[in-house]
């Protein structure tokens, strides 16, 4: 629930944002200089978390207000929808077998993760589902903020999984070449078109789609309307070829700072000993999920004769940009890898809100 719009509340929100974003930007730039993957997401999360945890006087002032967070989510949903294009159905027909295998692996990985977290570790269903679902870390963190109290736990699970993928995939593929992929990933992020390089019509279309989608989604009672609404609208318009919205560099960085900073602020207010058990569970869950995808890729490669490494990169949930760039470095079919990752993420984010809504309101 948003704070009342009093002068004091507005001042408090702006103060929190300034402190949080100053730390987030500084930490993000350091991570970028060090060549880490997703530097502004990891930098903002860990920077705000560590500094907030160490410096008690600013701890209570950290955070990102909801009135700022929601517009960022609206724009993020629009950009996610832009991953689908008019050629989506052609790809689906030519890659039918691998798509079916990827969908099956996603279901199996999710069920295996749920079994471990619910039956063995006794997690609540919603927290367990959000923690083990093999989707994009930033988007799941966005969703979790509205659904669970411990969204920082969800963030930990996904950060651990992505870190394991990015550290292990290069070793599996070609020993020590992973750093090349990290550098290429960061170069791709920097090469995204700037907001100042785009025509006003494109920016207007981006803003209009993001804004219009929210009331429409609320009117037709979509779950999580601020994310699902623009995601569906953007997907449909991109598939029909009516619009083409690129990933806007400044907005992608802003989304990373907002999401990472918000989660880092919450982590800073939780004692580390309370997090230790979740970190252990996150490693176990990540191994279960990644092993499921790896075994599926191995079985399909044995059956069809397709390249195991290419299938592994196409299936394994380790970040669209990072894994796609690993495919580029090692000479695999980039479209194949990117398509399967995009489809998996879209599958998760179209299905997840409805699954949660159904389990919360079974009637």
What feature does the model see in each segment?
Residues 70-81, 105-106, 132-141, 162-168, ...:
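Small-residue-rich segments of transmembrane alpha-helices in multi-pass membrane proteins
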Residues 1-22, 129, 153, 177-200, ...:
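Intrinsically disordered, low-complexity non-transmembrane regions of multi-pass membrane transporters
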Residues 56-61, 80-95, 111-124, 298, ...:
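Transmembrane alpha-helix boundary signature
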Residues 112-123, 165-186, 298-304, 347-363:
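Juxtamembrane and boundary regions of transmembrane helices in multi-pass small-molecule transporters
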Residues 135-140, 154-177, 292, 320-322, ...:
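Membrane-embedded alpha-helical segments of transport systems
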Residues 2-67, 75-87, 196-271, 291-298:
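Structural signature of multi-pass alpha-helical membrane transport proteins
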Residues 120-160, 308-340:
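Alpha-helical membrane segments and immediately flanking helix-loop junctions
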Residues 85-94, 175-197, 241-247, 273:
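Membrane-interface helix termini and inter-helical loops of multi-pass transporters
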């Amino acid at each position: 629930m948003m704070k009342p719009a009093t002068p004091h509340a507005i001042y408090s929100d702006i103060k929190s944002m300034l402190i949080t974003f100053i730390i987030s930007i500084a930490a993000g730039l350091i991570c970028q200089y060090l060549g880490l993957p997703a530097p502004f997401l990891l930098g903002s999360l860990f920077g705000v978390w560590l500094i907030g945890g160490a410096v008690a006087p600013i701890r209570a002032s950290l955070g990102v207000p909801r009135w700022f967070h929601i517009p960022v989510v609206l724009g993020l949903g629009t950009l996610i929808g832009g991953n689908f294009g008019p050629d989506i159905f052609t790809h689906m027909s030519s890659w039918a077998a691998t798509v079916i295998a990827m969908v099956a692996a996603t279901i199996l990985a999710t069920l295996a993760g749920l079994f471990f977290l619910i039956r063995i570790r006794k997690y609540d269903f919603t927290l367990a589902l959000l923690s083990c679902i093999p989707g994009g870390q930033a988007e799941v963190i966005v969703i979790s903020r509205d659904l669970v109290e411990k969204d920082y736990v969800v963030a930990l699970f996904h950060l651990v999984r992505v870190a394991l993928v990015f550290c292990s995939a290069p070793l599996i593929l070609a020993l020590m070449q992973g750093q090349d992929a990290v550098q290429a990933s960061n170069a791709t992020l920097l090469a995204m078109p700037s907001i100042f390089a785009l025509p006003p019509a494109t920016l207007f279309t981006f803003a209009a789609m993001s804004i219009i989608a929210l009331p429409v989604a609320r009117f037709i009672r979509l779950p999580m309307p601020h994310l699902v609404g623009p995601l569906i609208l953007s997907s449909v318009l991109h598939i029909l070829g009516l619009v083409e919205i690129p990933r806007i560099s400044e907005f992608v960085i802003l989304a990373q700072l907002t999401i990472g900073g918000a989660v880092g602020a919450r982590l800073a207010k939780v004692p580390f000993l309370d997090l230790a058990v979740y970190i252990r569970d996150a490693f176990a869950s990540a191994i279960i999920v990644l092993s499921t995808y790896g075994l599926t890729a191995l079985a399909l490669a044995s059956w069809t004769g397709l390249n195991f490494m290419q299938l592994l990169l196409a299936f394994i949930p380790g970040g669209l940009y990072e894994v796609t760039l690993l495919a580029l470095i090692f000479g695999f079919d980039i479209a194949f890898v990117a398509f399967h990752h995009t489809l998996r993420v879209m599958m998760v984010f179209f299905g997840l809100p409805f699954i949660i809504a159904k389990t919360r309101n079974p009637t």
